[in-house]
């Protein structure tokens, strides 16, 4: 009996160490800005096989091998944060109305819908529950949290996931420094509409005064003068994040086009210095990047290269 218990504890310890090792490895690669490894971010998790922004979607995306899941948050009537893209629950649940009109407990009564509209047995997760589901398994990008940085930072700290989270928004350098004071382990990524007036000064303010690990760029067309600025961003020891979710985010080079013409779309995005890609086709993108030799690099937390297969 003692031997069985001991074996159980050893297995638990091994799994814990392995989980911590995966996050450490991902962070090392992220911070190294190594262009030989392109990060794949699953938009709202694996929503093709579980309801978007659900615990199931997070777990399935992590099992698929993505590096990061993107989740959306909304604030409840009682001041908590839950996962939901829309401001109302009509599309994603068997309920109706605005998120802000319900308490957390009231929202928990509703069932989440799958992408085909059918009802699942999953319930709306809180931000805390989602972070705990990510812990040790996958990095997490929190969207729609730019106005709540100071409120969600303590939740991130309490769950022990400060080293898992990438926050983002359109805040100024001064706003970010003020709202995240005391939370230096949390990564913040600015978002810029690269084809808009004022984009370059905004980007430069972060590159010079904040030195982010990554910067998300959005652009509607693939033919405008400022597009070449991605090379300056990448040359500033900062990863370029591009979304291939739909045409208006990536100059027309989106996921569904990549299904038949991957080089003209995902390949084009890679040519724009992207080393983080948020996608609605994570499995296919991972396979494409592997064929291109852009998922082979792995590093330990000490910065030394580790054997292939760590990730």
Label every model-predicted segment.
Residues 10-18:
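Hydrophobic h-region of N-terminal signal peptides that target proteins for export
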């Amino acid at each position: 009996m003692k031997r069985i218990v001991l074996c159980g504890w050893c297995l638990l310890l091994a799994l814990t160490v392995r989980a911590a090792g995966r996050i450490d490895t991902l962070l090392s690669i992220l911070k190294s800005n190594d262009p030989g490894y392109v990060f794949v971010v699953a938009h709202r998790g694996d929503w093709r096989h579980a309801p978007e922004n659900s615990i199931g979607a997070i777990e399935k995306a992590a099992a698929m091998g993505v590096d990061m899941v993107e989740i959306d948050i909304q604030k409840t009537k009682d001041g908590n944060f839950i996962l939901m893209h829309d401001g109302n629950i009509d599309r994603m649940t068997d309920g109706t109305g605005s998120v802000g009109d319900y308490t957390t407990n009231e929202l928990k009564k509703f069932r989440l819908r799958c992408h085909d509209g059918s009802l699942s047995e999953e319930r709306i997760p809180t931000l805390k529950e989602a972070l705990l589901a990510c812990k040790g398994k996958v990095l997490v990008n929190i969207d729609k949290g730019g106005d709540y940085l100071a409120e969600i930072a303590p939740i991130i700290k309490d769950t022990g996931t400060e080293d898992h989270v990438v926050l983002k928004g359109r805040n100024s350098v001064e706003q970010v420094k003020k709202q995240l004071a005391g939370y230096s382990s949390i990564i913040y990524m600015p978002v810029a509409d690269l084809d808009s007036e004022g984009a370059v000064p905004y980007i430069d303010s972060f590159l010079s005064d904040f030195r982010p690990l990554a910067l998300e760029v959005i652009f509607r067309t693939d033919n405008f003068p400022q597009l070449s600025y991605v090379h300056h961003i990448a040359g500033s020891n900062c990863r370029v994040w591009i979304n291939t979710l739909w045409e208006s985010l990536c100059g027309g080079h989106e996921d569904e086009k990549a299904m038949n013409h991957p080089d003209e779309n995902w390949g084009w995005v890679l040519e724009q210095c992207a080393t983080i890609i948020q996608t609605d086709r994570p499995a296919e993108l991972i396979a494409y990047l592997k064929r291109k030799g852009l998922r082979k690099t792995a590093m330990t937390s000490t910065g030394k290269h580790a054997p292939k297969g760590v990730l």
